[in-house]
Amino acid sequence: SSHGKGKGTMIRRQRLKWLATLLMSFAISFSANAQELNATVTINHNQIQGTDASVFDNLKETLTNFLNDHQWTNLKFQKNERIVCNFNITVTKYDVATNMFTCKALIQANRPVFNSSYTTTFYNNTDNDFNFEFAQFDQLAFNEEVIDNQLTALCAYYAFLIIGMDLDTFSPMGGEDVLQRCMN
């Protein structure tokens, strides 16, 4: 009866192989779609009085999701390879009637230092003209062919700039193709 025992072991092995293959294909398809940015967005609206704060909370959530969930290039980034960046936006003026935001933004991006546990900042810039229209619950969509929204244009510009510069830190001219897209 040792013959029957071998057959059961073989079937279990085949099932395990099948399960392992299935799990690997899930992992690969998941990592293949990992976006490039790991952005943190903060909205400082202390200078704006008498406005419902929910519009600023919604802006923060919308920007965070847009920057992190949009696939900016066709490059494959693992989740742990995503570029850590910060968009610290200070609202200096907000017109409720026109949904116009006048802001300045401090944008920073970091990368890991090779063979160490710390990171270094490779991009740090203040944009004093980070101005756009945004109505609460607006959905942001980016089409590189037709840029019809100032907020998506600003996000795309900085996303391409950060990704391109990050690629340049790994190899000379490594980000040239992506940086070229900033000019569009």
Language model feature labels by segment:
Residues 1-9:
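N-terminal amphipathic/basic-hydrophobic helices that include classical n-h-c signal peptides
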Residues 1, 87-89, 183-184:
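Short, mixed-charge aromatic SLiMs
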Residues 30-34:
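Sec/Tat signal peptide C-region and signal peptidase I cleavage site
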Residues 19-29:
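Bacterial N-terminal signal peptides
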Residues 35-102, 113-115:
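Start-of-domain marker
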Residues 99-184:
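Acidic/His-rich structured neighborhood in mature extracellular/periplasmic domains
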Residues 8-20:
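Bacterial N-terminal signal peptides that target proteins for export
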